[in-house]
Design a protein with these regions (language model features):
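Flexible, acidic/Gly-rich N-terminal and inter-domain linker regions that tether
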Residues: 2-144
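Canonical Radical SAM [4Fe-4S] cluster-binding loop centered on the CxxxCxxC motif
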Residues: 144-182
Length: 183
């Protein structure tokens, strides 16, 4: 456990637990543990989170991350945006925009420009990996890359309780409909 070593001290349990609270870019600075970070470290997270989706919840933050071991904690690295997740030129482009007190549209335009260069669907998977029935009907919202695996992307399931920082499904979460695999 991250915050407590004695499970009996935890507020989280089978019979009772606090309400789930989500954290995204919009309230990243309200995460109590973030106060320990320098302004530069927080800015780095915000730069990356403008391009790649960030979402965590209070259970992950309170129970799964060992804040005494950050940045070495695996759950922290899996959940929180890291500067190296973007190419240096992409990071610099977004950081430059953010430093100039931009309008929301400027931020979105730069984020979308960078996202389009990230190749979220390599090898033609938007066309080539869509399953096809015997009658030729394409099953959009599904992906069949490997013989034993089919991925299903229902429209109503396009979210997670927390976004993993290296998830290949990030196009499902950033509001660029042409990049979604959803049904």
């Amino acid at each position: 456990m991250a915050q407590t070593t004695n499970p009996q001290e935890s507020l989280w349990g089978v019979d009772s637990s606090p309400a789930i609270k989500s954290y995204t870019l919009s309230n990243l600075r309200k995460i109590p543990q973030i106060e320990k970070f320098s302004e530069e470290q927080i800015f780095e997270m915000e730069v990356v989170a403008q391009v790649l989706p960030f979402k965590a919840n209070n259970y992950v933050i309170e129970q799964l991350i060992d804040w005494d071991n950050v940045p070495g904690d695996s759950m922290f690295n899996l959940t929180f945006p890291q500067k190296h997740m973007l190419k240096s030129e992409h990071y610099d482009m977004m950081a430059s925009v953010l430093k100039n007190n931009p309008a929301p549209k400027e931020i979105k335009d730069m984020a979308d420009k960078i996202r389009l260069e990230l190749n979220p669907h390599p090898a033609g998977q938007m066309e080539l990996n869509v399953p096809i029935l015997k009658d030729g009907t394409k099953l959009y919202g599904m992906q069949h890359k490997y013989k034993e695996t089919t991925l299903f992307f229902p429209s109503q399931g396009q979210t997670c309780h927390a976004y993993c920082s290296f998830c290949f499904r990030w196009p499902q979460f950033v509001g660029m409909d042409e990049m979604k695999f959803a049904m």
